Regions:
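Amphipathic alpha-helical repeat scaffolds of TPR domains
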Residues: 35-49, 72-92, 119-144
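Basic side chains
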Residues: 3-5, 113, 137
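Mature soluble domains of exported/periplasmic/lumenal proteins and thiol-rich metal-chelating peptides
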Residues: 29-32, 37-50, 61-62, 66, ...
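Helix-turn-helix repeat elements of alpha-solenoid scaffolds
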Residues: 23-24, 52-64, 98-115, 144
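Bacterial Sec-dependent N-terminal signal peptides
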Residues: 1-31, 83
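A conserved position within tetratricopeptide repeats
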Residues: 32-34, 52, 68-69, 110, ...
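Internal amphipathic alpha-helical repeat/solenoid segments
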Residues: 58-77
């Protein structure tokens, strides 16, 4: 009976450990998440970065959005490239409702960058200030 309780306890511990290792960065404050989520995050960063380099913003959007949502502390490029992707999508979009959706997401990019500013600034040599980001947000707001 004691052995059965021990096996059950070990099984429960292993399940909880698995859940911890499967967390996304947004859930635990890590840069990339853990386990498979970290691999997915790094793959998405690689994919969207290559698309941005070739100005293929439409295909860059989905992997970029996954990083933006799941690993907000992954890299500053999530925000700088995200703004670039969204500006291009707004300019190319003909549907007013979709433009508004992209515009609102662009404003959220700036807001989320401010939210995670301290953690993001630890990753770079030249840190941004809240004023820098607010200025970029105002520029995007009035130029879109």
């Amino acid at each position: 009976m004691m052995k059965m309780k021990m096996v059950t306890a070990l099984f429960a511990l292993s399940l909880s450990a698995t859940a911890v290792f499967a967390q996304k960065g947004v859930e635990d404050g890590s840069r990339f998440g853990h386990g498979q989520d970290s691999l997915n995050c790094l793959q998405n960063i690689s994919v969207y970065t290559e698309y941005v380099k070739t100005n293929n913003f439409k295909d860059a959007f989905t992997p970029w959005k996954a990083v933006f949502d799941e690993a907000p502390l992954a890299q500053v490029g999530t925000y700088t490239n995200g703004a670039k992707i969204l500006r291009a999508l707004i300019a190319a979009e003909k549907d007013g409702a979709k433009q508004k959706e992209y515009f609102n997401l662009l404003m959220k990019v700036h807001d989320q960058r401010i939210q995670y500013l301290d953690g993001l600034n630890r990753l770079v040599k030249s840190p941004a200030t809240k004023g820098d980001i607010m200025g970029a947000k105002a520029h995007d707001y009035f130029s879109m």
